[in-house]
Amino acid sequence: MYSNIIVKKGIMMKRSYIREILDATEEDTISFAGGLPDKELFPLNELSKASKKVFKNDDCLQYSKSQGIESLREKIASIYTNKLGFKTSKEEILITTGSQQAFDIILKSLNSNQIIVESPSYIGALGAFKMLNKEIIDFKKLKELEKLVNSSNLLYAISDYQNPSTNVYNNKKRKSIANILSENNSTLIEDGAYCFLNFKNKIKAPISKLYSNSYHLGSFSKIVAPGLRLGWIRTKEENINKLLAAKESLDLHTSTFNQMLIDEYLNSNDLFEHISKINDAYNKKMEYMAKCFKKYIPSFKFKKPKGGMFIYGSFNSDSMKLAKKALKDNIAFVPAEVFYINKKSTEARFNFTNESYENIKLGIKKLANIIAKTQN
């Protein structure tokens, strides 16, 4: 456990480093840093056709309900019921401007000042929590979590292809976490950004299905297009009114046009057929990156993920120092230090979805040369 002051300084340093990566990125930079989907897989033609239909309705440019347009909420609720086995109604869905906004909305509606996170954890969530002056406590094992959870704090968890570790909670761990939360009457924020990105298209039911005092976050960013900034919160109906007050104070409502665009896209296309294509393409890219690591940097130890967008592993030395050297040679990746509250690390995260096959190979070969020069 770390003091609020130490954690705040640490988070600000990490955000500064993320900005350093972005600022230093040139056109010829090979970036394995961001969680960017493969733009070649964006359904441009389908969205273009959908947009023409949407523009025939002048309501697409009008204000709309803060909770989100009803037909889109119905479709999202149907995904929970039919694909996740988690019975859900449209009244239990709130549309957000990207799932990132969900952190702000939820935390402004709750009185919890302390948030428990898995170590390592998603930098975007850590940054959002600190901007709201929340105390962050991390844990590694469930025994630690049992001692930390109480009725006045909440747990933030990514149960599928965790960012950055790529870990997936098995059914036993999901049940254990639900039981721990239930025994202590705590609150769960479960981030489901990657839950559909399973290379074998096998979807697990979220922890939230097992525990009602929960908020499950979803997003179209990884499965349709991130630029539309469309996400959602799934929670019990009695929580929605509290969330609406916070949502209205932020942006009144999520873009009407973008909601209607996604809604029309879902009317005319099979979303899960599209997701299956994404998973097949990502699995091939992951295998290729893994092959390149084994060939050119065999000292980088990792386990191949079964889904998601990242390979996470460990070098023989401080990954932050290596990342800064690599950035000077226009190779970007994220050292794991930014995902920890206050810890140096040899671990690192590499995105395999954004760059081409050619650049994956070239980038890892260049990184291998940088490591060789460092060792000499």
Question: Where are the regions that the model predicts?
Answer:
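Conserved core of the PLP fold type I
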Residues: D59-N184, I189, C195-Y211, Y282, ...
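Inter-domain helical "communication" segments and dimerization helices
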Residues: F199, E264-E273, K294-S299, K321, ...
